[in-house]
Amino acid sequence: MKDSRKKGSRKKGKKGSLEAKGLKESRSEESRLAQGSLGGVRPETGDSAETEIRTENAPGCRAELLPEDFREKMRKLLGKEYEAYLESFEKPCHNGLRVNTMKLSEEDWNRLSPFQTEPVPWIENGFYYNASDEGSGRPSRHPYYYAGLYYLQEPSAMTPANLLPVKPGDRVLDICAAPGGKSTELGARLRGEGLLFSNDISNSRAKALLKNLEMAGIPNICVSSEAPEKLSEFLPEFFDCILVDAPCSGEGMFRREPDMIKSYRERGPEDYVPIQRAIMEEAVKMLRPGGYLLYSTCTFDREENEGTIRYILDRHPDMSLCSLPHRFGFAEGIGMPECVRLFPHRIEGEGHFAALLRRAGSGERPRRKDRTAQSGASLKLPDEALAFLSCLNLRRGGTEGLPGQVEEKNGKLYCLPPDFQDMKGAGKGIRFLRTGLLLGELKRGRFEPSQALAMALRKEEYPFTADFQAEDERVIRYLKGETVALREEEASWPDGSWVLVCTDGFPLGWAKKAGLNLKNKYYPGWRWQ
């Protein structure tokens, strides 16, 4: 039988079908959406290096390709701004990078940057870059990317993490975190204090999330792959700040990634609304009194945005909206002026929505007093591991030594954030990919430091370093996994020493000295391709 629908319109699902099946079915649907099997869209699209590379020079979507029902909805939503919105499809999309302030300041970046960049007005550490400028190469193919100095991210996608009022020492949950653009910013703002708990229900996406957090040098992490209701079972009222960057229909990304329109025709807003509301319900359970919850999407749909917020406010009288700044072309929420909407005809970025909620209560949880850091001398470890850890010269946040409890599990050493000890039975009930900073691995009495540790260190915190300028061809050789030759004056360390390889003062990974060579120990899964 022929499909009688108009060309360009979206296939309608059974409205409310997911809602009727309850949270359990919503979780199953969310899992499939997160893994892309239903063409599901995550707000962080354009947030990983791979996506950014793919879309750097993409032609974008033409307005005439938009589904008819979507165009009609936007005409009603925007009124006299509708034509300006359509005209934005004729303009180029914008590429962005966000400086990792865990490793350097915006001022340091401005002095160091090899790229032509312009600041993103609403993000202090956000910059636009021109993908067609081949003079300094692509940011995704520069040693500084491998050093974790910045994260490639669509400019509007930088907004949610920036709006959540995180401060050092907080316990922060990013509940739909992969691939990690927002988590890496949240971690940088914690400054290594408190706890960053990053979760994604898709195990494969959670692995990419872990890599990006390690590359950014965030030490105080827990990374899990769990359903939200499982997290809330073990972590009630545990977090100071929560980010819900929810799966959505992706209407705000049509201009940048036309392929999303096909997914939209199969699965639209009515399929995502019950999923979003189920996630938010679990998030509220994990928020402490006085804590903040930031909800964001990359869609324009009212039910997915203001409708979901209204749903939560009606069911939770102790939750209230906080006003977000309406600067730089940000629009107010529809019927909720406290929220913000980002439109591509108003800003140099794609479509986004954000709302900040606060839970009533005094909210100040007691801070742990037993935050003394461990030094290598106090640990019961094999001699080689003890000797290596004793070499570390860590002095951060008023402490000296490792910033947490060191534990051994299956031959691997981890430095656990102090707040991890307050999770009670969560360690046995939640599927963790990582708890704390992986220090290294014990192999038949030998100790091999981890790639994650290298990225979390500063050059001055380890005594044996080989520091090459970014233009030195040996940097690329190292990133490709090759042996690196040293000049006589560069090889002053004892043979067999673990050497921290750096570029312009920023760590890349480990090598072992063998004569006038550095035997490559760069993690194979991260190598330059």
Predicted regions and their residues:
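A short acidic, Gly/Pro-enriched loop at the edge of an enzyme's catalytic core
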Residues: K167, E233-L243
